[in-house]
Amino acid sequence: MLRLGIVGLPNVGKSTLFNALTSSKAAAAENYPFCTVEPNVGVVEVPDPRLARLFELVRPKRKVPAVVEFVDIAGLVRGASQGEGLGNQFLSHIREVDAIVNVIRCFEDPDVVHVMGPVDPVRDHDVITSELALADLGVVERRLEKTRKTARAGDKEAQLEVVVLERVLAELNAGRGAREAGETDDAIRFLRQLGLLTAKPILYAANVNEDDLAAGGGKWLDRLRAAVQSHHEEAEIVPFSAKFEAELAELAGEERGEYLASAGVREPGLDRLIHAGYHLLGLQTFFTVGENEVRAWTMHRGGTAFAAAGEIHSDFQRGFIRAETVAYEEFVRVGSYKAAREQGLVRSEGRDYVVQDGDVLLFRFNV
């Protein structure tokens, strides 16, 4: 399951965003710093109209969407890397997620205090970036000291790791992230073991005023974009209004659509955030259909039928024979597996077949 950690300074809208994502009141959204002490965890459905269409056609007993796990982590402050505020708890929780959603305040409201004074998304961006880098710096320095001793004794694996760690250390000292150290197989392997924060993919959720939604943001969002670009970050920025999303979460059906239209937006910011997370991590969806259920599954783009089988159950991999495959568009056009077979649209693919986004798969296996 994809795990995204929601981070940011106190009072930027993290917990309000989390509440809207999970359509719950699990996260305390009071207007004071550190209202989220322990991380709140919520499982959110991945919005995908294709699953609803398959459900209409097949009419099984149930519909099972793909899901994303969001973790609302306590607000970070300057000095967290040295344990200030809730720094140590924050840093331990964030190391466990697949990617980071950095919520940046891009709105002004005198009733919502900012822990650092006036609204300044560039300053907030820099604080978060530097604290994560400082935390990683300590981890890398300690690991490098230990690994150098092993490398001097002639250990080839340790010698490779020293090269990677020295490159990472140089990037961190230059104010950049570990992700800038390259994407060689060795770098990926060693960095994964360390769980470095700045090696994790990141996207920005820019919390803007509701009035700025239709225009795609305002002056504060423009400044955040400039800051991200100046750091040469290839990170997507998703504008949203936590207040608007919280109100939208209370509505359903036509009321929901009307409320979106009134704000001049076509899609909830939360949906865009989830889709951005998928894109960031290189994920895609495939489907299985049957009398009991239609289900959406998540896998990495470029993954094989064998890998997809493992997403369902290890037995599917162990006894893999073939994957009977039909493209989503073809399945919807003819309406069923039976019709797809009759029209020669079902392909018998082996374990090395590269699954395409939206493929409808039926696995044949024997254990």
Regions found by a protein language model. Give the residues of each.
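Long, charged N-terminal accessory/stalk domains
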Residues: 87-193, 204
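Conserved short-loop catalytic and cofactor-binding motifs
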Residues: 78, 128, 296-297
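Conserved nucleotide-binding/hydrolysis micro-motifs of P-loop NTPases
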Residues: 24, 50-51, 74-77, 105-111, ...
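C-terminal-of-GTPase-core extension/linker across diverse P-loop GTPases
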Residues: 2-7, 12, 18, 146-356, ...
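Conserved G1/Walker A P-loop phosphate-binding module
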Residues: 1-113, 122, 131, 141-142, ...
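Short, glycine/charged-enriched secondary-structure capping and boundary segments
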Residues: 21, 83-86, 115-118, 218-221, ...
